[in-house]
Amino acid sequence: MTSYSLFWMSLLKNNWKPISNDFVICLWTLAVTFIRIYWIFFVPLEWKKDLDNEKWSFLRKTENVVCYNHKRDTINRLRKLKIQKIIELPPPYPNGWYGILKSSQLKAGEATCVSCLGEDLVIFRSKKDIVFILDAYCPHLGANLGIGGSVADDCVICPFHQWKFRGTDGLCINIPYSTSVPKGSKLKKWISQEVDGFIFIWYHAEQTELPWDLPVPMGEIDDTFVYHGHNEFYINCHIQEIPENGADIAHFNAIHKKNFINGSWAQKKRLFGLGSHHWKARWSPFTGKLKYLAEVNLSHTFKLFGKFGCFRMEVSGKQIGPSIVCLEVNSYTFGKIKVFQYITPIEPMLQKVVHEFYGPRWIAPLMKIFIYGESLMFERDIKIWNHKVFNRNPILAKEDASIKKFRLWFSQFYSSNSKIYSEATNIGW
């Protein structure tokens, strides 16, 4: 053994000490603190609830019904009760743009299946990053191209027999085991657009109507804004009832006055009397070439102990067609925030609603609170929607004038060939 090795062994023997418990605790504390800081500032908050997450059990205490063993039975029973008033329902699928898939959920060279608007669709992205949407079922033997289908150039290939369909027009251009393509081998091609990180589809009952263009970008997001998270809900109601909330001025202070700490069901009495939310709202439609737009303006103040006004917010929003809302929130507390709402009818009485939140990076801790509070507030509306019926001719107070204006404005999204409820749910042979 060399003198050099003996020197280092002697040094380690005389100076080595076991790591103290205090040092280990310090390391763990630093690690946990770092992870928490990283989560607060860099991890988006995701909040998702479907009909199974609804607390339906309280209904059995107030309704004379047979108790089912499974929550799904109760949900289906209530949905059938609501459908009894189908004569009141407007067509379930209004004409317009619908956000049906996040851009991040579809990579180049991938195909996926989406069911919405009473249709099954295959959505695929070419290697050149172009998105195409076609009817999902192969005209050959009915395979779903969105489940197992592959992408080549701007085409999607059926997983069953490798029939190849072109995304630009839906035509079948190749059958690997045949020298010709049968006449009529074509899938319907849907008009689509990719904006603000979402893939949108144009739906129109007349099929000949040219769509209005979506504003690009809809919310004017710049480089200072980052994605902070989203929530996603499934709701048992007609699509029209959700955006109608913006024109229902009286509901804001009826449903959303109580402190969000009270939770998602504001009727419950809690011990939290710290303060309440106070709202002022205004809704108005656009006219002329922009008649497919409407505007909502909200003023919010949180009154601490019912006296001291704080957490003031000014909210301005645009309703784009039947399903899209872009909100801009200005607040001394939260700064400037962008919120996008996308509604997609899955079935005539089942809506998927997504809210996406954007803001500066530095307000990330406050955004977690904002998203949490907004989600709870929205769940209060969902409690109402899940258990109400649609009244075609409601009795309105004079203060409800904006609801009448909204319904007149929204009626433009129905046309002569819009499917009524019985047509949208008809299954024939």
UniProtKB/Swiss-Prot annotation:
SUPFAM superfamilies listed in its UniProt record: Bet v1-like (SSF55961), ISP domain (SSF50022)
GO MF entry, a single one: oxidoreductase activity
Catalytic activity: cholesterol + NADPH + O2 + H(+) = 7-dehydrocholesterol + NADP(+) + 2 H2O; cholesterol + NADH + O2 + H(+) = 7-dehydrocholesterol + NAD(+) + 2 H2O
Names of the cofactor(s): [2Fe-2S] cluster
One Pfam family cited in the UniProt record for this chain: Rieske
Topology class, membrane: Single-pass membrane protein
Pathway(s) this gene product operates in, as recorded in its UniProt entry: Steroid hormone biosynthesis; dafachronic acid biosynthesis
Domain Rieske: 98-201
Family the UniProt entry places it in: Belongs to the cholesterol 7-desaturase family.
Protein name: Cholesterol 7-desaturase nvd
